[in-house]
Amino acid sequence: MPRSLKKGPFVDHHLLKKVFEAQESNSKKPIKTWSRRSLIVPDMIGLTIAVHNGQQHVPVLMTEEMVGHKLGEFAVTRNYRGHAADKKAKKK
């Protein structure tokens, strides 16, 4: 179920504070965050945010198409390497 419109978008306060500081200083340094639950707002466009995926921070450049999505959608947490190969099929 989507979030109620009267509540507005959710962005962690510490992340929003870092975004405004980066905009004021025109910093190109990535903003590190563990807040995968935060929504991408128009203020973040053009910034690089390093989103934690459980092991490392994945740098994500914010674009206009990403507005309305959550940060965690762009930092994959699972690493699928394929199914184990069948030994009998390899010998043939």
Swiss-Prot record:
Any one annotated GO CC term: cytoplasm
Superkingdom of origin organism: Bacteria
GO molecular function: rRNA binding; structural constituent of ribosome
Disulphide bridges: none
Gene Ontology biological process terms, A to Z: ribosomal small subunit assembly; translation
Keyword Glycoprotein: no
Gene3D superfamilies: 30s Ribosomal Protein S19, Chain A
Sorted UniProt keywords: Ribonucleoprotein, Ribosomal protein, RNA-binding, rRNA-binding
HAMAP family: Ribosomal_uS19 (MF_00531)
Function per UniProt: Protein S19 forms a complex with S13 that binds strongly to the 16S ribosomal RNA.
Record family assignment: Belongs to the universal ribosomal protein uS19 family.
Official protein name in the record: Small ribosomal subunit protein uS19
